[in-house]
Amino acid sequence: MAANLVVNAAGLGAQRLAESINGLNPKTIPDRYLARGCYFTISGKPPFQRLIYPVPEPGGLGVHVTLDMGGGIRFGPDVEWIDRVDYEIKPERADSFYSAIRKYYPELKDGTLQPGYAGVRPKITEKGSAAGDFLIQGPEEHKIKGLVNMYGIESPGLTASLALADIVAHKLGLPEIKDGTT
């Protein structure tokens, strides 16, 4: 495939896609590490009407509370370093959730947590290392005109998507857009 502009924002597949780009120096491609995050839910009336974020833990924000659009509640995610993409939620992981959640919700009863869902975050730093920021490489870094590679873009990337788009546009030398006009 030939293109004038390519933005590699493939998330978990960003490194693999970058490896397929002709002329890209493999040394510019960071290693990929995988961190599964599981969520558990509870049934019944949610005990909270607001988000709760405990003090962050290494590798993530800790088991926090989020509310979904249907009025339900989710606890998570945790951080489990894995070797391959795997979305299985092991029920025994609930044990560590109970202790984490009881730090801010001591009334949580045993047996109330139910597996919700899991996601896999693309990390660019390995277990035990300080958390890495997003890595966004343009032509200045890898010497290929019209290419931007984005690595380690995890869930905050959704919140920061407009700012990330500005960074990508700048790296590609595109004109700035103001108030919907160029």
PLM feature spans:
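Active-site substrate-recognition segment that forms the wall
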Residues: 1-143
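Glycine-rich phosphate/pyrophosphate-binding beta-alpha loops
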Residues: 57-60, 148-161
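Internal hydrophobic alpha-helix adjacent to the cofactor/substrate pocket in enzyme cavities
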Residues: 161-179
